[in-house]
């Protein structure tokens, strides 16, 4: 059975933060380091057992800084991925928790997927 091909668009946020050690769940932001999406996927290889993941870099910023301009950029990147690679079966967007629901709501309204 072939694995689904899934694009993973990275936008930064908590999920991409690099702590001082693996259990740094509180003060990770003080380290001021973030994974780009391909580095994040390499750090957690287990999902690769379930799908062929295609990393797509967009930006790596705190989710508190994401707003309308970024939402448009995310939507444009989703459309670009779909248009450029018809073999993509799905898209995952990594995102921090602070504005996740706003981004999801915006994409629900405007994405033409």
Predicted regions mapped to residue ranges:
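Short Gly/Thr/Asp-enriched flexible loops that form oxyanion-binding sites at enzyme active sites
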Residues: 93-113
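Structural motif
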Residues: 89-90
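N-terminal glycine-rich anion-binding loop in soluble enzyme alpha/beta folds
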Residues: 2-83
